[in-house]
Amino acid sequence: MLEVKELKKSYGDLHVLKGINIQVNKGDVISILGPSGSGKTTFLRCLNFLEPSDDGTLIFDDETYDLKHIHKKQIASLRKKTGFVFQNYNLFLNKTALQNVTEGLIVARKMNKKEAIEIGKKALDKV
């Protein structure tokens, strides 16, 4: 389960996220909808620690994290357990589709290349 409590983010006097609360259970698939500029991307960037949060609590895998004071080691550990699809995706143009799919498994998850290729091929067969 993933739970976020009172997530806050401001840029100077502009309060973008004002105490966001959400709970996502294992197996849930969710969509975040809203007009342009409503904070959807900022919310996801804060959840993936691509941008610092001003305040809030994250509960993931029965562990509680203070989003304002989270440590780099905690961030690295959480990133190994989560995924993030960017609004504007970026591919390595000099690599094949399979190489793009397996890159994260090999680099971030330290998976051996053979296993990553097997998983990558299965994923590509689905699209």
Regions found by a protein language model. Give the residues of each.
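Short coil-to-beta microelement around the adenine-binding A-loop and adjacent beta1/P-loop entry
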Residues: 14-15, 76
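The feature captures the beta-strand-to-loop junction immediately N-terminal to the Walker
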Residues: 33-35
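Helix-to-loop junction immediately C-terminal to a conserved catalytic motif
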Residues: 48
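Conserved ABC ATPase "signature" region
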Residues: 62-66, 109, 113-127
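ABC ATPase NBD coupling module
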Residues: 65-83, 113-114
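ABC ATPase nucleotide-binding domain signature
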Residues: 81-82, 86-90, 95
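Short coil-to-helix segment of the ABC ATPase nucleotide-binding domain corresponding to the Q-loop/switch region
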Residues: 94-104
